[in-house]
Amino acid sequence: MVDSPSMKDHLLSKIHDRTAVIGVIGLGYVGLPLAMEFVHAGFRVIGYDVSQRVIDLLMAGQSHIQDIPSQVVQEAVTAGSFVATAVESRIGECDAISVAVPTPLSKTRDPDMAFVLAAADAIARQAHPGMCVVLESTTYPGTTRELLQPRLEAMGLTVGTDTFVAFSPERVDPGNSVYQTKNTPKVVGGITPACVEVASALYASCIDVVVPVSSPEAAELVKLLENTFRAVNIGLVNEIA
């Protein structure tokens, strides 16, 4: 008797065949370019955002960010490859979801996790077996394991077996015409080896270079280190100037 394919193998097959439906939560300067890369790779993409103004613009074929021409959005919408929505239930149609919501600083200079928590709760309400969820928002080490994983497990899902959770930091440099979403290396750290495998396959479908790391905490720290390195160097050059 032949064993039925696991949730992991089934999702990997759908990613390979481009039959997986991809969700992107947060359609700003990170999420929209990522959504368009998935479209260009041959996927159907559902973009979710809480701003009805953004939804209306995108569905009218108009881009609201510098790095994505309106023509690109118009072609994706016309072809039926991309839809933007503020209807939470449509998250449940997705096989894999990238979360690219803001993490601004609060008045006390602490990270404001409200957008991440809202996205995590929305996903948990719509989650189903076989779903992959990847957090991209810049945040502190431990966020994926402490905030995202428990919400999915509270819905009866087992991370690493029937749902796959990872962190892959957004590294977009808005306005940079040389390094954009597709050719900027993508770091991926998952809760389990199966999570890393699925999330890496997801991004490898549309990103030139994918770099798996040992854990979501390692991937979360990569972004903080990169931001710190950049800030220190900018400050140093400004002082010398």
Where do the language-model regions lie?
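Structural/interface elements that position substrates and couple domains in central-metabolism enzymes
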Residues: 2-241
